[in-house]
Design a protein with these regions (language model features):
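Short hydrophobic alpha-helices and adjacent helix-cap/hinge residues
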Residues: 1-104
Length: 104
């Protein structure tokens, strides 16, 4: 799949983007360490916790058809200042202050 292809080549993608002064933005924070500029996406652990709560409700008798569809509610912003410097980008202090994680 395209997702698997991108994941298996994330380092190469980040290196090529950096060489061409292009930012790489990922949907998951764990991918930023490979050289991406930033990530913004749902907290990776939250859906599993939410799923466990839903399973618990079902095991206690709730009907799945009666349960609402849930969407992510917590999103994480991770910024890689090394990558920003490599492509000549300055991240404003107010954006850094809102980040959940900063790679320096």
């Amino acid at each position: 799949t395209l997702h698997a292809l991108a994941n298996s080549n994330q380092g190469r993608i980040a290196a090529l983007a950096s060489k061409n002064l292009l930012p790489v933005i990922y949907p998951r924070g764990d991918l930023v360490a490979s050289g991406g500029l930033m990530s913004y996406g749902p907290d990776r652990d939250e859906p599993f916790r939410r799923g466990a709560r839903m399973v618990d409700k079902i095991l206690k008798g709730a009907k799945p058809a009666d349960m609402p569809v849930e969407q992510p509610t917590k999103f994480e912003l991770i910024i890689n200042l090394k990558a920003a410097k490599q492509i000549g980008l300055t991240i404003p202090p107010n954006v850094l202050a809102r980040a959940d994680g900063v790679i320096r």
